[in-house]
């Protein structure tokens, strides 16, 4: 048996999600090979080769894989699939687009967002916004799996796997790149941030996010998140959304400001190591999962907290 892990990367380096998905892939009990597909992605492939537990790295380097189009990548994975018993990828936005296509082309059922490998054919995954854990046994000869990486430790270095080039698959011609707008920020990306400060609908405006949430995040060296309600109201961009329909995070510290704690939001952050909630409603559901709670007006409490951090030299 051999498992193929699809790497999440930016060509220059691997994303943390890849290291964590490798831990899940290794738990299947088979040799793990890693596919790095991109343009100018040799550095990412070399990084994958250094990960402990990787037997071989496949590098598909070409313009076809430059812009994360799902159809060409799915076609490449399917062309490699006969050599593997399982195909694994982190459950990132990119692979939520790619892996269902792979499963459909292979005519198998995808097992989504697993949080535990019970056996090579049996997995646990959250359902009902994380309120129940479902055990799934796959009878498909070839497994297609995405991994909720927040529940797995990152694999370390220590390997020296060979890097082998593979040819690009035929372009299905089903999509073409038109353009992209990339959000640039000096703050940590949400899924890899050790500290996150998130704001909810109580922030009331985009300006208040900039006035209250962002200065606190800057003092803590944190990523900035938002609830779905805040994003839907236009107070924060989509890529800040934390929750079942946004990003699932598990930082060392999660600070929820003006977030009531809807079940959809809790599903995306309840695995955080320490949760701090600031809300003037003492009955807000967020306090049920918080390790520390402050019942206070955020417009008074957050500036005071930011100022105190400043005194500490943050």
Swiss-Prot record:
GO terms for molecular function: electron transfer activity; flavin adenine dinucleotide binding. FAD binds at residues 253-281. Its cofactor is FAD. It comes from the Bacteria. InterPro entries: DHS-like_NAD/FAD-binding_dom, ETF_a/b_N, ETF_a/FixB, ETF_alpha_N, ETF_asu_C, ETF_asu_C_CS, Rossmann-like_a/b/a_fold. Keywords: Electron transport, FAD, Flavoprotein, Transport. GO terms for biological process: fatty acid beta-oxidation using acyl-CoA dehydrogenase. Binds 1 FAD per dimer. The electron transfer flavoprotein serves as a specific electron acceptor for other dehydrogenases. It transfers the electrons to the main respiratory chain via ETF-ubiquinone oxidoreductase (ETF dehydrogenase). Heterodimer of an alpha and a beta subunit. Belongs to the ETF alpha-subunit/FixB family. This is Electron transfer flavoprotein subunit alpha. It comes from Bradyrhizobium diazoefficiens (strain JCM 10833 / BCRC 13528 / IAM 13628 / NBRC 14792 / USDA 110).
